[in-house]
Amino acid sequence: MINVEIIKNYDKWREHKQINKSLIQKITQNILLRFNNFSKIKQFELSMLLTNTAEILTLNKQFRNIEKATNVLAFPSNELNWQDLYSKLEFLGDSDYMHLGDVAFCYEVIYNESCEQQKTFENHFIHLLIHSILHLIGFDHQNDTEAHIMENLEIEILSYFGISSPY
């Protein structure tokens, strides 16, 4: 079970009814099921903030010390490494619960990027959702090798949902 808490504090998000708890749960479940090590966990939790440029600017300044609006910010609750997902996850212990983390999405940046890249807003959001969930479970793109691995996994998951590669 994946419990998703969504806070929509920017009205433009309400125009996209298909971006809802059910979609987020379905995508998150698709990602987690790819890693057998998560199978013993019965309940996952994820918090989402669907917000605007002003709040993303504040979050970026506060947590990343940058003065720029970004499309998404992911705050993992656990220090996971993607390489450990393919081996034994002893650090999870006997817990059957995991809070994955918090994610904040910026409407205006996503909207502008989707227009520039000639994608639907929803498809671009789904890509960023996949990208952010992968960050929450330990994937990163600090070097070319990591970026390639993460991008290939994103492409595979997007394909499952009928969305073409953004790369």
From Swiss-Prot:
GO terms for cellular component: cytoplasm. It is found in: Cytoplasm. GO terms for molecular function: metalloendopeptidase activity; RNA endonuclease activity; zinc ion binding. The gene is ybeY. Its main location: cytoplasm. Disulfide bonds: none annotated. InterPro entries: MetalPrtase_cat_dom_sf_prd (IPR023091), YbeY (IPR002036), YbeY_CS (IPR020549). Zn(2+) binds at H131, H135, H141. Pfam families: YbeY (PF02130). PANTHER family: ENDORIBONUCLEASE YBEY, CHLOROPLASTIC. Belongs to the endoribonuclease YbeY family. Its EC number is 3.1.-.-. Binds 1 zinc ion. GO terms for biological process: rRNA processing. It is an enzyme of class 3 (hydrolase). This is Endoribonuclease YbeY. Gene3D superfamilies: Metalloproteases ('zincins'), catalytic domain (3.40.390.30). Single strand-specific metallo-endoribonuclease involved in late-stage 70S ribosome quality control and in maturation of the 3' terminus of the 16S rRNA. SUPFAM superfamilies: Metalloproteases ('zincins'), catalytic domain. The keyword Transmembrane helix does not apply. It comes from Rickettsia akari (strain Hartford). Its cofactor is Zn(2+). The keyword rRNA processing applies. Keywords: Cytoplasm, Endonuclease, Hydrolase, Metal-binding, Nuclease, Ribosome biogenesis, rRNA processing, Zinc.
